[in-house]
Amino acid sequence: MRRLLTGCLLSSARPLKSRLPLLMSSSLPSSAGKKPKQATLARFFTSMKNKPTEGTPSPKKSSKHMLEDRMDNVSGEEEYATKKLKQTAVTHTVAAPSSMGSNFSSIPSSAPSSGVADSPQQSQRLVGEVEDALSSNNNDHYSSNIPYSEVCEVFNKIEAISSRLEIIRICSDFFIKIMKQSSKNLIPTTYLFINRLGPDYEAGLELGLGENLLMKTISETCGKSMSQIKLKYKDIGDLGEIAMGARNVQPTMFKPKPLTVGEVFKNLRAIAKTQGKDSQLKKMKLIKRMLTACKGIEAKFLIRSLESKLRIGLAEKTVLISLSKALLLHDENREDSPDKDVPMDVLESAQQKIRDAFCQVPNYEIVINSCLEHGIMNLDKYCTLRPGIPLKPMLAKPTKAINEVLDRFQGETFTSEYKYDGERAQVHLLNDGTMRIYSRNGENMTERYPEINITDFIQDLDTTKNLILDCEAVAWDKDQGKILPFQVLSTRKRKDVELNDVKVKVCLFAFDILCYNDERLINKSLKERREYLTKVTKVVPGEFQYATQITTNNLDELQKFLDESVNHSCEGLMVKMLEGPESHYEPSKRSRNWLKLKKDYLEGVGDSLDLCVLGAYYGRGKRTGTYGGFLLGCYNQDTGEFETCCKIGTGFSDEMLQLLHDRLTPTIIDGPKATFVFDSSAEPDVWFEPTTLFEVLTADLSLSPIYKAGSATFDKGVSLRFPRFLRIREDKGVEDATSSDQIVELYENQSHMQN
């Protein structure tokens, strides 16, 4: 077959009759006395002649397009022939042979056809760049020969059940199974389970695939028209189901080589890292290669992975628990034991070990490899925070009154700091002298602040190898020497920032140090950490300063300090335990050892909420032409769903409404996503991809038959009363939205206070 295909293309510029002798002699190598496989030739031409088409055939197509469309269906044993054909295709441009019928010339192209053939140079470049993307991503540590179909079968089982314990059992059993074959299978498999391509702080891992691109790819790969795909999508709202249905009824010329976990994961990373000219075409080519090889339910979950939403009710913390159980059994060589149960206290200890490790080193590859090398029960010794990897920041619980603060810290030594109205900034100095700045959700935002150089704030560079600081980046007026509102900070560019372009200066207000010269400080008291901070760093007015603080338990002094913080353009106070184990830094935890007291929220629920924009309602009157209101939802961390909690239309300026219209309109989708939990009576005029968070104030919370937040806890959902827009949260991803559990907790605390 390899010779046959090569012969077909090499002779493609000749009339069909003159090519037949060559084709008839180009069968597979045969032993002496064996006749050429003419039946194979007949099937080959018949499949091309009978290829279903739509639209008007182009009078001339590039041979590269014709070839790649046909070769999207070739893999496995035909890989050699594919490469040879691609090398040859770019030197030929052919017209459709009339004797084979017009169907041959109208084989659908994967690239937009203008009726003009690509030049050989353009064709060669596109093919080469696609293969470069694949080869450059060929990392051995992501290799896995586990059939992708096995992962999809697990996803299918999980989708059909709701019991969290059963999901944990299914996941842990599968992790144990693949570790028996090879422990290297675990890393790419885990990333597929949590639907990520690497750690959050690694740049360039956003797939960036819109619905239209995926629809077009499914259309061209599966021989369906765009109108058919869109009609079906409007009906069922699941591109994965559509791709599975279309793929399973489509015949292929060759039996594709089965997909593996390693292949799928590497290709997903290659798609994410594909940028620049023709990037969309190159991404489509990579998707087609996988989609063509999909069987059964594989297409369904491949497309969902490409959408970055599996929608099977598998939360990341469930995967972490499953991993801890599997790794614990792996350590104890109990995978084959008929009784895999382990004592609950041991299992809970293993779960806590892996949670703590991941909060300090949010990188599954490092955490899993450390477990495999040292054992999960030794993670706290070998897998700890390190400069260059952003740990998940400690967070504070909201409170509504100074009396509540005094009650919480009664008999304890505590301290209060200004709560600055800026952007959380975790600053790392690395051994090689480079600096990195990370946001609260782990995004590398070093390039956003070119004017900051941490080495300017170090007391002794000769003795300081590395460190990690916890700070707030605040807009600063250098002329008047004062803090500017957050709205001023938000006007700074977020990408491609040049030093000469900086108009809004920032000052770093440091309030904690977490690591110094490889010494982990999070298990020291806040009082000790403050001593480290002032010893190794120095104040540079207007550039690097310490958070203003006071240590007192006097009610009047605290009230005065709160008023002063507001007068200095701050949000309020952060009140923290100062001494003892309770003052240790707890990565990722929203702890009652840190309380936030915001002046604006003393009469409300005690805190603002960060809610995801799910849809919008058209404006009327003076708001005609923009959106007049928005449907907001919280995030359920257990199910991965967004649960509606209010409609908001207050707090917006005309300028903000126009900005939101321009920002959100490109994200409109045809209907609600399967992860949106809502009541039809609150259905908006348009639905959006979940991309944007609003920070919202509310007077209080109430139960509602219309909204769905926390409905798993109550008979009704929890809704916000009189919500008011504050700002867009640029520093948070949508999965960092206020959770359903947090809304339930706020409602219960409010009810308790009222009673």
UniProtKB/Swiss-Prot annotation:
InterPro entries: ATP-dep_DNA_ligase, DNA_ligase_ATP-dep, DNA_ligase_ATP-dep_C, DNA_ligase_ATP-dep_cent, DNA_ligase_ATP-dep_CS, DNA_ligase_ATP-dep_N, DNA_ligase_N_sf, NA-bd_OB-fold
Positions of the UniProt region annotated as Interaction with target DNA: 309-318, 493-495
Composition skew (Polar residues), residue ranges: 47-60
Cofactor(s) this protein requires: Mg(2+)
Site (Interaction with target DNA): 164, 441, 622, 647
UniProt-listed GO biological process terms: base-excision repair; cell division; DNA biosynthetic process; DNA recombination; lagging strand elongation; maintenance of DNA trinucleotide repeats; mitotic cell cycle; nucleotide-excision repair
CDD domains, per database record: Adenylation_DNA_ligase_I_Euk, OBF_DNA_ligase_I
Pfam families tied to this protein: DNA_ligase_A_C, DNA_ligase_A_M, DNA_ligase_A_N
GO function term, MF aspect, one: ATP binding
Binding site for ATP: 417, 424, 440, 576, 590, 596
Described function: DNA ligase that seals nicks in double-stranded DNA during DNA replication, DNA recombination and DNA repair. The mitochondrial form is required for mitochondrial DNA maintenance but is non-essential while the nuclear form is essential for cell viability.
Name this polypeptide is given: DNA ligase 1
Species of the source: Saccharomyces cerevisiae (strain ATCC 204508 / S288c) (Baker's yeast)
The organism's taxonomic lineage, starting at the top: Eukaryota, Fungi, Dikarya, Ascomycota, Saccharomycotina
